[in-house]
Curated annotation (Swiss-Prot):
Residues 1-31 form the signal peptide. Residues 32-294 are extracellular. The keyword Membrane applies. Residues 316-695 are cytoplasmic. The chain crosses the membrane at residues 295-315. It comes from Oryza sativa subsp. japonica. SUPFAM superfamilies: Protein kinase-like (PK-like). Involved in disease resistance. Required for NPR1/NH1-mediated immunity to the bacterial blight pathogen Xanthomomas oryzae pv. oryzae (Xoo). Required for the benzothiadiazole (BTH)-induced immune response. Possesses kinase activity in vitro. The keyword Iron does not apply. Disulfide bonds join 96-105, 108-133, 215-224, 227-252. Residues 38-142, 151-261 form the Gnk2-homologous domain. This is Cysteine-rich receptor-like protein kinase 6.
Amino acid sequence: MRRHRPYLDGVAAAAATFLLAVLLHAPLAAGEDEPPPWVLCGPYPPSGNYSKNGTYQVNLDLLSTTLPKNTSSSPAMYATGTVGDVPDKVYGLALCRGDANASACERCVAAALRDAPRRCPLVKDVLVFYDLCQLRYSNRDFFLDDDYFVTTYTLQRSRRVGAAAAAAFDAAVAVLVNATADYAAADSSRRYGTGEEEGVDGDSDRPKIYALAQCTPDKTPEVCRTCLSTVIGQLPKEFSGRTGGGMFGVWCNFRYEVFPFFSGRPLLQLPAFVETPPPPPSPSATSGEKTKNRIGTVLAIVMPAIAAILLMVVACFCCWKRIKKRRPEEQTFLSYSVSSDDIQSIDSLILDLPTIRVATDDFADTKMIGQGGFGMVYKGVLPDGQEIAVKRLCQSSRQGIGELKSELILVAKLYHKNLVRLIGVCLEQQEKILVYEYMPNGSLDIVLFDTDKNRELDWGKRFKIINGIARGLQYLHEDSQLKIVHRDLKASNILLDFDYSPKISDFGLAKIFGGDQSEDVTNRIAGTYGYMAPEYAMRGNYSIKSDVFSFGVLVLEIITGRRNTGSYDSGQDVDLLNLVWEHWTRGNVVELIDPSMGDHPPIEQMLKCIHIGLLCVQKKPASRPTISSVNIMLSSNTVRLPSLSRPAFCIQEVSASDSSNPYSERYPRPRHSGYSDNSTVVSSNDLSITELVPR
């Protein structure tokens, strides 16, 4: 049977008149689901009927010819439209599920427009929900309505878990659904998210759970999350103990099941929900364990480090001999194969050399703003007034041609607001030049590690930078047409625009993964000490989790204002990761917060970011979160952060009397009261290792 209930949006309660909810529990044939579509005829206070073959029906038929194609051709698979004039004007809206392809989307919307008049004959206001799409048309302008119409449904095969397990299962569902809602609200392009939460092995009442959440993409993150929060709030009442259910609405919807019901890999993956986290180790126990394991820990770090250094010395010698034998003509740009697709993507970006010479005053020294691993970077202005950054490969040096080609092909295919944008390329007269949008605030390291400039970075800007880097990295790892590992994520490769929004740059060392590939190995290590993941620095194994490690280092650098010196050298007594970890375990990590941010920073939010940073630099790649999970952690207050273990490359602390104490003058503590105005920058991690290989 069906029943109706009203509910109000928390934000727009004053404006909304009421909300209609329908619980579908109609008996079905054994073993069958209630088949879509779910249809509501006249969901709002009755708006009347239209006349057969009248003006309203003509307008509705016209809408039916355009709305399916408009929806499927939209990047977000969402469209609205109007036809005719009041009082016979038709307002229409269609949204396809985020995992639907364009053809399936178009078919679904077309079917909904055919079915709706048959199921609700001559009704002016109709709401239809299919599995892959939803449709509403009305004689009312509902596009700016503050209220939501929601239908709640459960599938017949949805069962109830045992009474004893219901509370734990409901809690697990709530964690996943809320995290997925956070993801959807944060998705700037589609407002769509899917999630998966691991089950508990051997417990039939705690299976793996899948969830999907979506809003119409025209909603802001705040409105989307408010809508989802409101409908998710019905979980305890409607779905307690049930293994599946969901709600459809005009502006937002969610669903969860214990089986995969959406296409593709979940965008969010969570570990099994644990009701009671294990208690933290006592200080005395931690101290005892440190003493017991000190020798083993030091040996575990020192021996691989020595072996790695010896291997790198041998590798450098071999490379030197190989380069010495190489003839100049062998090292040309054309020696690096370029596919026809690559050429097609590059062709539209070609700039002529005279234009670039004029833009940079013929590469004047006064226009030089930096130096990369392959040459100089100049500031320029195109004839239309656009400011540009020009990266010019040194003609006298053959180093970097492979990097240039790799970067050109990759960046030409990528577009995201947190990736630096490629404007053009010039390959005339033996010049190899890339032209990028100009970033007025330079690179992050220039601002962050300068004792004067870092005062420009208050916590709001730093948190925006952390979020932006994470979103850009997620695009590279999961959301772009290519699956890319950057391999050289560091502060100097994060550029800042006029309002300090970050953009990831320098894709010369990036690698593309195909299909389901998640990791690879190389005997040519390339990157920057201090940011390399241990498995990459020591064994050449790299994956998306290598980038996550680099991101974690960046987070800790941004919060503390200190460079990570790295600890691949066994003679290095301490690095930033160790410093943060020791303070974290002692409960005084707040002392490491960069004092240049002022007197009253949001400590709780900073501690959360430090926790996330430490999660990202765990020694084992499997212990690090995916970057999509990091984005959820950053944007959500409902996700419980996993517990921490000692990060990679941490060396046991020395005694307080030791002259190499990490809290000596080399690493002075900021004064806790009011924070000190003095900021100490430790030794630079500017050592990069690059071995260029034709790709």
